[in-house]
Structures are given as structure tokens and as C-alpha cells.
Amino acid sequence: ADVPGNYPLDTRGYSYYCTILGENEFCKKICKVHGVSYGYCYNSGCWCEYLEAKDVSVWNAAKNYCKNPVGK
């Protein structure tokens, strides 16, 4: 079964480049920043399972998940 997800985007609007395909600690950390618990490297970019469109941009994810009130 295909799991839904998205490629998250960094502060410049680019996907996160990765070189170690599959299980990838860097991508897992990135996906956590974007509010989901799991991701991996697919096709040279971090892919996050269950990442919703509203959290694809790191700016949106930060607004949605960071507890720091600055900028709200």
C-alpha cells in the first residue's frame, strides 16, 4: 500500500537533497521538523510519510509546531 506524503521544502523552497537512499537519519530529522515522525531518502530528496501540504514549507511547519511565540 502506498503511504501518502510529500517532499518537504527548506527555507529557500527547495527539497532537501540527500545521498544515502532509503533509511536516512538526516531525512528523519527533517521530517520531525516538519511535524511528522518518519521519512527517508528517495530519488535524492527527503520524503516524509504523511506530510500534509500545509506543512511542506519549513516556514509553515515552524509556525504550526514551534512553541516559541515570536512572530505570531
From Swiss-Prot:
GO terms for cellular component: extracellular region. PROSITE patterns: LCN_CSAB (PS51863). Expressed by the venom gland. The keyword Methyltransferase does not apply. This is Toxin Acra II-3. Has the structural arrangement of an alpha-helix connected to antiparallel beta-sheets by disulfide bonds (CS-alpha/beta). The keyword Disulfide bond applies. Keywords: Disulfide bond, Ion channel impairing toxin, Neurotoxin, Secreted, Toxin, Voltage-gated sodium channel impairing toxin. Residues 4-67 form the LCN-type CS-alpha/beta domain. InterPro entries: LCN-type_CS_alpha_beta_dom, Scorpion_toxin-like_sf, Scorpion_toxinL/defensin. SUPFAM superfamilies: Scorpion toxin-like. It is found in: Secreted.
